[in-house]
Amino acid sequence: MASSEQAEQPNQPSSPPGSENVVPREPLIATAVKFLQNSRVRQSPLATRRAFLKKKGLTDEEIDLAFQQSGTAADEPSPLGPATPVVPVQPPHLTPQPYSPRGSRWRDYGALAIIMAGIAFGFHQLYKRYLLPLILGGREDRKQLERMAASLSELSGTVAQTVTQVQTTLASVQELLRQQQQKVQELAHELATAKATTSTNWILESQNINELKSEINSLKGLLLNRRQFPPSPSAPKIPSWQIPVKSSSPSSPAAVNHHSSSDISPVSNESTSSSPGKDSHSPEGSTATYHLLGPQEEGEGVLDVKGQVRMEVQGEEEKREDKEDEDDEDDDVSHVDEEDVLGVQREDRRGGDGQINEQVEKLRRPEGASNETERD
């Protein structure tokens, strides 16, 4: 018990020497009282108890108070022999014995059963893996061979089917490739032909355009030449009173009308306007020439008159064309309508034929007058 009490006292602070006048500490005194009241401590001598308490840091006053409160100051053990210092006895150390429950036997039995079961399972596996194949090896081999043969036959059938399917798919793919190649070749041929046709069409169009440009340029040149250069001078005109006319031929007016309407081009009115005055001034000279000229000379005179009339008509046509060209300067030459031009030419020709008829009628009048003078 002294050792236990000593273990309880290590936390108590030790008082420094020379601190006797310090106020007694109640908790230390209380612990000292408990220590002194212990039965084993009470059997020890008083000096040893005091020395132990001083070692724990208690002063003499605190020790006296502890003895008074514990009531052990008068206790004095009976001396049995020589005084020997009392040493606190420690209890002997006992070794712990293993705990043996009552069901240990059942555990032993269970472990034995588990071991036996493992051994039996091992023997069973050895028998199943090694002994049975030796005993029943022929049967198993036959069954395995039969199974392998069946699986091989199934595999061969499936392989044959897959091969046929692959062959059919390859044939279809080859056919599709051939068709695609044909289509590609056709498209390439069509493209080549289209390129060739487009190139030829482009060349032809360019040629046509060039021709049209050249024609337009030529027309422009002609128009400019007509405007720049003066018209060609006409042949000298013969007055109508000098033209020989046969008096005895009654069919001459009809012949003249026939030639004027069919062979003679449009004529002008210049020769006709000058011929009547001259005929009126010299009717006798005209009659004299009629009697002097022969039939051949009369025919030549008529032809000369026709040529003069044609020249005059051509001059008037050129003047009219110049006027029309001046009116059409702002119009594009390429957009001229051919039908309008033909209509204008026809109208000009009709007007020229009417002028020729008028000239012929005017030429007939002196012939009739001369015939009347001859008859008189």
From Swiss-Prot:
The modification N-acetylalanine is found at residue 2. Residues 1-12 have a biased composition (Polar residues). It is found in: Peroxisome membrane. Residues 2-108 are peroxisomal. GO terms for molecular function: beta-tubulin binding; identical protein binding; microtubule binding; protein transmembrane transporter activity; protein-macromolecule adaptor activity; signaling receptor binding; transcription corepressor activity. Residues 247-259, 265-275 have a biased composition (Low complexity). Residues 359-376 have a biased composition (Basic and acidic residues). The chain crosses the membrane at residues 109-127. It comes from the Eukaryota. Residues 323-341 have a biased composition (Acidic residues). InterPro entries: PEX14 (IPR025655), Pex14_N (IPR006785), WH-like_DNA-bd_sf (IPR036388). Keywords: Acetylation, Membrane, Peroxisome, Phosphoprotein, Protein transport, Translocation, Transmembrane, Transmembrane helix, Transport. Gene3D superfamilies: Winged helix-like DNA-binding domain superfamily/Winged helix DNA-binding domain. Residues 1-24, 70-102, 230-376 are annotated as: Disordered. Residues 88-99 have a biased composition (Pro residues). The modification N6-acetyllysine is found at residue 34. GO terms for biological process: cellular response to reactive oxygen species; microtubule anchoring; peroxisome transport along microtubule; protein import into peroxisome matrix, docking; protein import into peroxisome matrix, substrate release; protein import into peroxisome matrix, translocation; protein-containing complex assembly. Residues 128-376 are cytoplasmic. The modification Phosphoserine is found at residues 232, 282, 334. GO terms for cellular component: fibrillar center; peroxisomal membrane; peroxisome; protein-containing complex. Interacts with PEX13; forming the PEX13-PEX14 docking complex. Interacts with PEX5 (via WxxxF/Y motifs). Interacts with PEX19. Interacts with tubulin. This is Peroxisomal membrane protein PEX14. It comes from Mus musculus (Mouse). The lineage of its organism: Eukaryota, Metazoa, Chordata, Craniata, Vertebrata. The gene is Pex14.
